[in-house]
């Protein structure tokens, strides 16, 4: 009787262990990539990448957050595997402000040329003296916006400062006495619709969400030549060569994704493979 009881007990124990082993195997075999991304165009591009990643054995989960400042924090706090919303100058600025962030660029995916929009004027040269220019309060973006104004001959920046690092305080000449107003990036399209400024800088993602195409609607579009503002996949330092991140980048640099970007955004968003 004792032998029968002991045998039954061993069988139950073996069954429990087998079940545990099976669960652990399923968990360890789970191949999921979690990416925090802004809605347009980033999350849309990732959605197109989802079936391609599935072919490689990965499930893609995309998290759209409500504030730019949340994306790198979520990545640093290991809430996500990667984020997709920023360019390198912005990432570098974020890490200057948050020294505990140890994040790196895993690769560029696309470029969003900045556009300047106006309800009143057809070109930057038409802006009158004292015109109000609305730009974003994102310090890492100011250099690229000011470069557009300098290229149009409206201002002169301090030659000792790298353009990518320039801010409003680096304006040395402003012959038209342009006035500058800073607003959050997500409010620029609204400022344009409400005619709050004579000219308004709008990030492409917010332009697209508000049915604006920089190629067709902007009075000036940022040059893509030697442009350092390509949007990247950012990851934690040391994870850029992990299998899941390599798979993600391979898919995002694939011809199918390149063709999708070119067709869907009609020049407002340009694919990059580097």
Swiss-Prot record:
Q: Which CDD domains match?
A: PBP2_lipoprotein_Tp32 (cd13597)
GO process terms (BP): amino acid transport
Q: How does it sit in the membrane?
A: Lipid-anchor
- Family note: Belongs to the NlpA lipoprotein family.
Q: What is known about what this protein does?
A: Part of the ABC transporter complex MetNPQ involved in methionine import. Binds the methionine and transfers it to the membrane-bound permease. It has also been shown to be involved in methionine sulfoxide transport.
**Its GO CC terms?**
plasma membrane
Q: Where is the lipid attached (N-palmitoyl cysteine)?
A: 20
How does it associate, per the subunit comment? The complex is composed of two ATP-binding proteins (MetN), two transmembrane proteins (MetP) and a solute-binding protein (metQ).
Localization, per the record, is:
Cell membrane
Stored Pfam families: Lipoprotein_9
Q: Which InterPro entries match?
A: Lipoprotein_NlpA
**Keywords linked to the UniProt accession:** Amino-acid transport, Cell membrane, Lipoprotein, Membrane, Palmitate, Signal, Transport
The UniProt record lists lipidation (S-diacylglycerol cysteine) at 20
Signal sequence: where? 1-19
Its protein name is Methionine-binding lipoprotein MetQ
